[in-house]
Every structure is written in structure tokens, then in C-alpha cells.
């Protein structure tokens, strides 16, 4: 869901600030210290190590991957993903990352762009099937488009691309079946922000990188096994093969600076002095980066995501997921032995009693999948600060990758990638950071 057109790319995302923060690649030919092993940090470390740089990756927690990881859940007795993520075949940065670690085959999905939906209120089901090329002839096929949507409604996509910087999705996209049955659920999922507040330009970037490029770029993909098995474990193996060092449970608590350069790190083993050619990629969450590097702007308003996993076996259908209209959940994902539900922009649900929430969602899952019988074992995960709120105000707080320190760059989906907080944005930011420090494309 994630790459945007050149017209919409920020200067940082286009790399117009030059190959390096200070211009000269040779100046930073030493060791690179990558702080934070989420996808942004992993992507930066991977590209730097592949370019022959000595890399040390520090992760404060016990495991790498950040919000994109899998773990064994004792309540369910099986491995589950921390959250549900849907990728598209046109996510260029994510696909390049997976190719670099030899893991593209770990994603699965239909052979063609296929997006099944269910309207919970009416019981109506349909499947959106964009045509392969850029010409949207699928809009004229009743078996491929949104039922009930009038042809004029599709002009909303053009208006979205011309939205002002401050416009919200709700300002730009008119009421109608296209909005209710496609654009609104896509916007809420991509931005993790209600459409009344979600920034229209950020959503336009998502559309520009997916629907606007044609159906061949919109084939939905999900991990066959788990997020860690696709994005984390192969990366750690590749980094080890390239000679990079990965230190988990290793929190960096301070960055020393002198005369416009980062000169030291402080970790659990004490102070680490940087040589003149060394550099840092600061790939922690925004609030942590602002603490380590005072004066760093970062988003300070956040939205939650709720994920619910049921221990149940269901028919995955054609795509392995289904979009829900008119309920609490936006998506239901079906994997062997586990049925998962995702609710985006979920701040409103943080205080709702778990039993009430699960009961409602189980009803939606039953309607979507045809499951019968008593509610199975479940695990509810409320991630309170899942992403920054994708509003105009928060967009203004997203920093470029470069910093006042000539040998320190930023990475993370919260930086100004030109996209909302997504896997594609996180990986893109890591690649940008590596390029700024001289890594080959």
C-alpha cells in the first residue's frame, strides 16, 4: 500500500539532499552504529553491511523486528504475529528488502489483485479486481468494481491527488458507496487515523503507489508463516553472514556530541568512543530519538491498533483475508489454525471492556467466515501507540533523515518518508539513511 509518485515524494525520500549529510562519502567510511532494530534499523543495517561497511546493531528489547514480529503466545499455544500487515506487490522498498534477504517466497497471496469484501449490515459480498495495467477499465465491469458506486464517484480519486496540504480525507472524498465500501476502509487502514482527521495527501501517496499504478502493483501479500519468518529471521541470518554484529537487550542511553558530530555512545557496557570515520543511524521510535538527540522534532500524537486472534480453523478463501464494511473490524485474516481481526484508529476502544469487545468481534468473524459453535480461545492485543496520527499537524513534525550532526542520520516510519506509518515507509527510511551514509543502492 505504499509507494508514492515522484510528484508527491518529499526531498528526503527522493534523496535530493545529496548522497551524504555533509557531501563527502569518504568522510564516513568507518563503522556504522545502528540504534534500534525495527524494520527501519534492519533495512539500514542490511544495506550498509551489504556495501561492505562494518555494522553494529543495538536493540533495547530482547528481540528484533519492533512492531513487525512474531512470538509464541502461551494463552493460545501457538505463534502469532504482533499485528496484521497487508503488503502489495508494488511496495518497491519492501520487495527489494525481501529480495536482498532471499525471502520474497515467504509471502503468499492470490495470483491477481483480489480484494474480497462483506457488508455486515446487508450481507452483500463482492470482490474488487483492478485490471492489470494503468488504464482502469475494471471500473466499467460490474463484476470487478464496487457495487452501487456511481461512475462519477471515481472522480474522487483525481480530487484526492490534487488535495491541499491541510485537507483531510473526509474533505476531499465525497459521500457515496465508493467511499463507504472502499476508500474509507482503505484510508483508515493505511493512515491508522479516522478520515475526519487523516491527511488527504498521505492517503493520496498510498493510492499513487497502488491503484494508480494498475492492478499488477496491487496484488495483496501476507506472510505464509509469520512476520518474523519473513522480515526478521532471514535478515539476522544475512547480517551475520555479512559480518554485522547484533546486540539485543542493549539499550543506548546517551549520544555524546562535540563540534557538530556524534562522538560517543553510552550503553550497558559503558561508553563507546566513535572514530572520525564512524557514523550513527538513529532508528528508534520518535520519542526515544527525541530523548537521545534533544531538539529532534517527532510526532507526539498517536493512534492505537487493536488486534484479536482466535484459535480457530477457517476457510481462507481466495485471498486469505476479507474486508468488513459496517462493523468494528476492518479486516479478517485467516491463517492455518488462527483467525485474526484488525481494528485501526482504535483510540476509541482502549477503555472498552475486553469481553464486550471480543464478543462483538466474534460475531463479525462468524458472519465473515461461516464459523459456528462456541467462541474459541482468543488473545486481544491493544497497541496504544501503534503509529503516529496521520494528520496535517503531525506531518509537520516529521523530520528529514539528515540532522545537525554530520555523522548521524535518522530512520523510522515516523520520519518524513512521504508515506504514513507502514512497512514500506519504515524500510524506505532505512534505505534512505544507508544511502546518506554512502551505501550503494
Indicate where each model-derived feature is located:
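Mid-domain catalytic core of redox enzymes
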Residues: 28, 113, 250-370, 400-402
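N-terminal Rossmann-like FAD-binding beta1-loop-alpha1 element of flavoenzymes
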Residues: 30-57
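Glycine-rich FAD pyrophosphate-binding loop
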Residues: 49-74
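Glycine-rich active-site loop/strand segments that organize a redox cofactor
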Residues: 66-90, 156-161
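Short beta-strand to alpha-helix junction loop
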Residues: 85-92, 163-165, 174, 214-238, ...
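Mobile amphipathic helical/loop "lid" adjacent to a hydrophobic cofactor/ligand pocket
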Residues: 90-208, 217
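Conserved flavin/dinucleotide-binding core of flavoenzymes
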Residues: 129-130, 332-441
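Helical element adjacent to the flavin cofactor pocket in flavoenzyme catalytic cores
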Residues: 206-269
Amino acid at each position: 500500500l505504499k509507494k508514492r509518485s515522484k510528484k508527491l515524494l518529499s526531498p528526503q525520500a527522493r534523496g535530493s539532499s545529496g548522497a551524504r549529510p555533509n557531501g563527502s562519502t569518504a568522510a564516513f567510511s568507518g563503522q556504522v552504529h545502528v540504534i534500534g532494530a525495527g524494520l527501519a534499523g534492519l533495512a539500514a543495517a542490511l544495506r550498509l553491511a551489504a556495501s561492505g561497511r562494518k555494522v553494529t546493531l543495538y536493540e533495547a528489547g530482547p528481540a528484533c523486528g519492533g512492531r513487525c514480529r512474531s512470538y509464541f503466545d502461551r494463552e493460545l499455544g501457538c505463534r502469532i504475529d504482533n499485528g496484521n500487515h497487508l503488503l502489495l506487490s508494488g511496495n518497491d522498498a519492501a520487495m527489494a528488502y525481501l529480495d536482498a534477504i532471499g525471502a520474497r517466497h515467504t509471502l503468499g497471496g492470490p495470483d491477481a489483485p483480489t480484494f474480497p469484501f462483506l457488508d455486515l449490515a446487508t450481507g452483500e459480498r463482492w470482490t474488487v479486481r483492478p485490471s492489470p495495467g494503468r488504464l482502469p477499465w475494471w471500473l466499467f465491469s460490474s463484476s470487478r468494481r464496487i457495487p452501487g458506486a456511481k461512475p462519477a464517484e471515481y472522480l474522487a480519486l483525481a480530487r484526492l491527488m490534487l488535495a491541499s496540504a491541510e485537507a483531510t480525507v473526509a474533505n476531499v472524498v465525497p459521500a457515496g458507496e465508493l467511499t463507504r465500501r472502499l476508500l474509507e476502509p482503505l484510508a483508515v487502514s493505511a493512515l491508522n487515523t479516522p478520515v475526519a482527521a487523516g491527511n488527504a495527501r498521505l492517503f493520496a501517496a498510498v493510492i499513487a503507489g497502488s491503484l494508480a499504478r494498475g492492478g499488477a502493483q496491487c496484488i495483496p501479500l501476507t506472510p505464509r508463516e509469520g512476520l518474523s519468518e519473513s522480515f526478521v529471521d532471514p535478515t539476522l541470518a544475512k547480517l551475520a553472514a555479512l559480518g554485522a554484529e547484533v546486540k539485543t537487550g542493549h539499550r543506548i542511553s546517551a549520544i555524546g556530541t562535540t563540534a557538530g558530530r556524534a562522538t560517543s555512545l553510552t550503553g550497558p557496557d559503558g561508553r563507546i568512543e566513535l572514530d572520525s570515520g564512524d557514523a550513527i543511524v538513529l532508528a528508534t521510535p520518535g520519542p526515544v530519538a527525541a530523548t537521545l538527540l534533544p531538539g529532534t522534532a517527532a510526532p507526539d500524537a498517536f493512534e492505537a491498533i487493536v488486534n484479536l486472534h482466535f484459535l480457530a480453523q477457517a476457510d481462507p478463501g481466495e485471498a486469505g483475508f476479507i474486508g468488513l464494511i459496517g462493523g468494528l473490524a476492518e479486516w479478517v485474516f485467516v491463517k492455518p489454525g488462527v483467525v485474526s481481526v484488525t481494528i485501526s484508529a482504535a483510540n476509541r476502544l482502549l477503555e472498552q471492556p475486553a469481553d464486550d469487545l471480543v464478543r462483538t468481534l466474534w460475531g463479525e468473524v462468524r458472519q465473515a467466515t461461516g464459523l459456528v459453535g462456541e467462541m474459541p480461545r482468543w488473545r486481544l492485543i491493544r497497541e496504544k501507540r501503534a503509529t503516529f496520527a496521520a494528520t496535517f499537524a503531525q506531518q509537520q513534525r516529521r523530520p528529514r533523515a539528515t540532522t545537525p550532526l554530520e555523522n548521524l542520520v535518522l530512520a523510522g516510519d515516523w520520519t518524513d518518508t512521504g508515506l504514513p506509518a507502514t512497512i514500506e515507509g519504515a524500510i524506505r527510511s532505512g534505505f534512505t539513511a544507508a544511502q546518506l551514509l554512502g551505501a550503494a543502492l
